[in-house]
Amino acid sequence: VVVPNLYIVEQPQADALRAFVERGGYLVVGPFSGVVDATEKVHDGGAPGLLRDLLGIEVDEQWPIADGLTEHIDYAGETLTVPSWSEWLEVDDDVEVRGTYASGELDGLPAVTRRAAGAGSAWYVSAMFDPSGLIPVFRDVLCSAGLPAREHTDVEVEVVTRADDTTDYTFYLNHGRTPVTFEIPAAAVDLLTGSRHEGRLELDRYGVAVLAAPRAESIPFATLIPVKEDA
């Protein structure tokens, strides 16, 4: 479950998210979350409010980045760009720091954290990245959940998989003006055209395909697509 900016948090929401994680779910919470209740009253202790115990972090100070400046985060050896928003975090002893600020006033402080809870884990992302910056973060989340991740670097491409008990349905959408080609590791049938594809799928500009494959032969990865800034 990904909650990019859950500004308003009430107790039922916090309880549901905790139950989800403790049952084995993976929760990713974005910056400026858990700030107020439904009446716009700031939670005692500040953000992330009712999610504080689950995430194991406290936002000591919200740290907007001035226009024209950028800061950076070191994430497993990769340098991620932060153009607009960061937060000063205090973390509990049982929290694992996955990414660290690598410039500016927050240099050396935690930026992305993970805390185990029950059978799952709760992650907090304290910065607003540029679109490509989320790729290594979600690669890490998927890997820790035992889900291989395959990336497509074209921000105008979207790939989403849905499934029932027997079949995976993978939706390919090309939002761009140029054709794109995908490598697919399993034979599949396009439900829109009836065509069978093996190894490769080519989509024209603004093209769409819905590929169906048996679960045993289904595409064994998730594809990460960064959101366009002007979307």
For each of these PLM feature ranges, what is it?
Residues V2:
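N-terminal Rossmann-like NAD(P) cofactor-binding module of classical short-chain dehydrogenase/reductase
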